[in-house]
Amino acid sequence: MAKRVQVVLSEDILSLGKDGDLVEVAPGYARNFLLPHGKALPVTPAVLKQVEHRRAKEAERLAALKADAVAFRTALDTIGRFTVKKQTGGDDVLFGTVTNVDVAEAIESATKKLVDKRDITVPEVHRTGNYKVQVKLHPEVVAEINLEVVSH
């Protein structure tokens, strides 16, 4: 069996892993490609310490993002209801439909905080009334808001 060497990746490599991963590769691959092109670093105690420090900072950053998302979800729950005004015809039928852009604008006007329209899931809305809309604030945090569609 061939000898393998350990290196720490300094950038994402599709077939090996992500930046900061400790991987085992063939010695020639490390010596001829990864190390000269700056795609990996040889394993030393200093490099391992640096990688652990970077991982800890990244974990703190991700935890802070999640905490912000949870706080924003609480703020959305506190507001309770968001209103979108649309033009209607007879029997409260809308001309057009309510889109995720409309919901994003309603959230922004109420909270002064931007929400990406791609993170909003709106059910099919063709009449005035109340609807539940899901807003993905973080990969692990989803808020469900009440949307009131009214005629103007």
Curated annotation (Swiss-Prot):
Gene3D superfamilies: Ribosomal protein L9, C-terminal domain, Ribosomal protein L9, N-terminal domain. InterPro entries: Ribosomal_bL9, Ribosomal_bL9/RNase_H1_N, Ribosomal_bL9_bac/chp, Ribosomal_bL9_C, Ribosomal_bL9_C_sf, Ribosomal_bL9_N, Ribosomal_bL9_N_sf. One of its GO terms (molecular function) is rRNA binding. GO terms for cellular component: ribonucleoprotein complex; ribosome. Keywords: Ribonucleoprotein, Ribosomal protein, RNA-binding, rRNA-binding. It holds the Pfam family Ribosomal_L9_C. GO terms for biological process: translation. Binds to the 23S rRNA. Belongs to the bacterial ribosomal protein bL9 family. This is Large ribosomal subunit protein bL9.
